[in-house]
């Protein structure tokens, strides 16, 4: 059977709880590699492993769904595997499992700096396995570096995402203090979002503070509420790395109906909050594409010797009150 083989390590609820926003008109340049030797010819069966960051539920369910759709459309076998707990050693172990299974191609949901993957990428290349990243390209990059350890990168430009968030706040007339929080300090993408937003706000003369949080919504609410008491001039707060629940609770408990909340990625909670006005907008990376495009790019490389000439940017885009209805309509279908 073609499609996605889910490799479970624990019981998980497979109901999709989030989605992505309307696809933007991004383009990709494809170049033919002259004389390239690949692990499969156009007539061979192709086996691709997608090494995820987590179980195929919630946010990561959309990456898995994208990989599944690509497998069905291309007629290839896609195996989705993931570590029980997301650490660099655990994810490397899963990559090694895919290599041991003689995968033709591997796409990894890279969450750490390139240095963490350099050794396993070199070993995959030596074994003749195509190795790509289902994550953001280097900040500001467009054209692929020929010396890149990854065959391709398919993800959102997180530096641009932070700047977009700041731009939207400035367009809303924000002039007071803004707090930007990262709930997962070890995640380089979330930190880049936060840093880029803060830098852009400060460049425009707006006071912007960084706040480190945990992934626990209750602790997030307590931390933000305490910050708001210390800084009553705060006019906006951004959640860069988790669902918006803790921020919504802090807004309600503090009686700050005027507090502008913004976030990243899409959850049912954020869509509802955007619809009723409690949240202004969310920055979306369109993670369905982060699952679909790596499978397509690996398949086309393995069968036809094609490699992307530029990095494929899945975002950033914005979901706000003007388009939230369209996004919600596709959430239950697993595409948004």
Residues of each region from the PLM?
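Hinge/cleft segment of the Venus flytrap/periplasmic-binding protein
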Residues: 44, 181, 200, 204, ...
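Extracytoplasmic "Venus flytrap"
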Residues: 45-70, 74, 79-95, 103, ...
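Short, solvent-exposed amphipathic alpha-helices that sit
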Residues: 59-74, 161-165, 188-207, 223, ...
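Short beta-strand elements in bilobed, periplasmic/extracellular small-molecule ligand-binding domains
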Residues: 73-85, 179-180, 200-218
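Short, well-structured alpha-helical segments in soluble
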Residues: 89-104, 220-233
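Hydrophobic alpha-helical segments within soluble ligand-binding/sensing domains
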Residues: 91, 151-178, 220-221, 266-270, ...
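Hydrophobic alpha-helical
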Residues: 110-126, 197, 209, 213-273
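Flexible loop/hinge segments that line or gate small-molecule binding clefts
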Residues: 115, 120-160, 267-280
């Amino acid at each position: 059977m073609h499609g996605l083989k889910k490799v479970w390590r624990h019981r998980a609820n497979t109901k999709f709880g989030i989605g992505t926003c309307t696809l933007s008109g991004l383009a990709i340049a494809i170049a033919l590699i002259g004389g390239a030797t690949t692990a499969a010819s156009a007539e061979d069966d192709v086996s691709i492993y997608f090494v995820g960051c987590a179980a195929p539920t919630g946010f990561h369910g959309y990456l898995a769904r994208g990989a599944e759709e690509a497998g069905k459309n291309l007629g290839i076998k896609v195996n989705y595997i993931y570590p029980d707990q997301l650490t660099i050693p655990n994810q490397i172990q899963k990559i090694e499992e895919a290599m041991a299974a003689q995968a033709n191609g591997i796409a990894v949901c890279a969450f750490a700096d390139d240095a963490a993957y350099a050794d396993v990428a070199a070993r995959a290349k030596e074994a003749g396995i195509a190795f790509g990243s289902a994550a953001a390209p280097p900040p500001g990059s467009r054209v692929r570096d020929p010396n890149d350890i990854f065959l391709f990168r398919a993800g959102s430009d997180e530096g641009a995402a932070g700047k977009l968030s700041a731009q939207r706040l400035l367009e809303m007339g924000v002039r007071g203090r803004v707090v930007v929080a990262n709930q997962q300090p070890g995640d380089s993408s979330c930190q880049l979002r936060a840093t880029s937003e803060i830098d852009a706000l400060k460049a425009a003369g707006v006071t912007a503070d960084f706040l480190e949080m945990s992934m626990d919504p209750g602790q997030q609410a307590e931390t933000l509420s305490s910050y708001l008491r210390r800084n009553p001039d705060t006019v906006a707060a951004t959640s860069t790395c988790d669902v918006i629940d803790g921020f919504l609770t802090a807004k309600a408990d503090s009686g700050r109906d005027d507090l502008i909340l913004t976030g990243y990625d899409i959850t049912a909670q954020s869509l509802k909050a955007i619809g009723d006005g409690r949240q202004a907008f969310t920055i979306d990376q369109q993670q369905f594409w982060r699952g679909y495009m790596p499978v397509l790019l690996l398949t086309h490389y393995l069968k036809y010797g094609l490699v992307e000439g530029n990095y494929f940017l899945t975002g950033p885009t914005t979901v706000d009150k003007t388009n939230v209805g369209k996004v919600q309509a596709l959430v239950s279908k697993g595409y948004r």
